[in-house]
Regions:
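N-terminal presequence-like segments and the immediate start of the first folded domain
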Residues: 1-53, 58-195, 200-222
Length: 222
C-alpha cells in the first residue's frame, strides 16, 4: 500500500507565463505516476502492472476527463480498480496541487495474481475496470448510479411528485445491485464485504443510504 502521493516538482507545473504547454492536471498526473508511484513500486518489488486498486483525489471535476487520458496511457491493459473522488479547493497540503493518488499493489514475485472481473455492469467512467480480484480480496471500482443516459431512471425524482420517493435510496439500490453482480462474478457476495467507503454530496443522505444497506445485509456490522 502506497501512501497518498502529490506532485511537488517543476516538471509537474505549467511554466510561468505559458498557456500552451499542456494541462496542469496532465502534467501532475504524469509526474506522480512516472516519478513517484512507479519508482516506489519498483523499490517494493512491484510494478504498475500489478497495481490492483487506486484512489484518485481531484480538486476539480473538470480534471476527470484529462486525468483519464493519462491513466489510460499508463494502464492500457489489466487496469486496476479505481475510484475518482472530488475534493475541496484547495484540497491538499500543497495549495496549488490538483491531484493525489494512493495505491495498493501486489508484488511481482508473489503467488497472488491479479484478475480483472467483468460482470457486465456500467462503470463510473468509460474504460475503467469494474473490479480486480487478488487472491481472497476483491477490489471494486468506485460506483455511481449512472448509465449511458446519466442518472439511472429509477433514481430520477418526478418533478410533479418531488416528495414521493428517495433518490439516494434508489441510487444505493442500483449500486448495490451492480456490486452484487460483480461479487457473484468473482465468486463471492456482498455478505463478505469488509470495507465500505461512501462519498455523499449531502450528509443528510447518509441514513437513508444506510437503510438500504440494512435491507441487503440485515443485522450485519458494516
Amino acid at each position: 500500500h502506497l501512501e497518498p502521493l502529490s506532485a511537488a516538482d517543476v516538471q509537474a507545473r505549467m511554466p510561468a507565463g505559458h498557456l500552451w504547454k499542456g494541462l496542469s492536471i496532465k502534467l501532475e498526473a504524469e509526474f506522480i505516476i512516472r516519478e513517484k508511484i512507479a519508482p516506489a513500486l519498483k523499490a517494493a518489488g512491484s510494478s504498475l502492472q500489478n497495481v490492483v486498486k487506486c484512489q484518485v483525489y481531484l480538486r476539480d471535476v473538470e480534471d476527470f476527463a484529462p486525468f483519464n487520458e493519462v491513466w489510460a496511457k499508463h494502464f492500457p491493459r489489466q487496469k486496476p480498480a479505481v475510484t475518482l473522488i472530488p475534493t475541496a479547493t484547495p484540497g491538499f497540503f500543497l495549495e496549488d496541487a490538483r491531484i493525489e493518488i494512493n495505491t495498493i499493489a501486489l508484488t511481482d514475485a508473489g503467488r497472488t495474481r491479479k484478475e480483472i472481473i467483468d460482470a457486465g455492469v456500467a462503470t463510473a467512467f468509460a474504460g475503467h475496470s469494474q473490479a480486480v480480484r487478488a487472491g481472497d480480496l476483491l477490489f471494486i471500482s468506485g460506483m455511481l448510479a449512472a448509465d449511458a443516459g446519466g442518472l439511472v431512471k429509477s433514481a430520477r425524482i418526478d418533478p410533479a411528485q418531488p416528495y414521493f420517493g428517495s433518490s439516494v435510496q434508489a441510487q444505493m439500490e442500483a449500486m448495490l445491485e451492480s456490486a452484487q453482480k460483480i461479487c457473484r462474478a468473482a465468486g463471492t457476495s456482498l455478505a463478505n464485504v469488509v470495507r465500505i467507503q461512501q462519498y455523499h454530496t449531502d450528509l443528510a443522505d447518509f441514513f437513508p443510504a444506510y437503510q438500504v444497506w440494512e435491507r441487503h445485509l440485515p443485522a450485519q456490522h458494516l
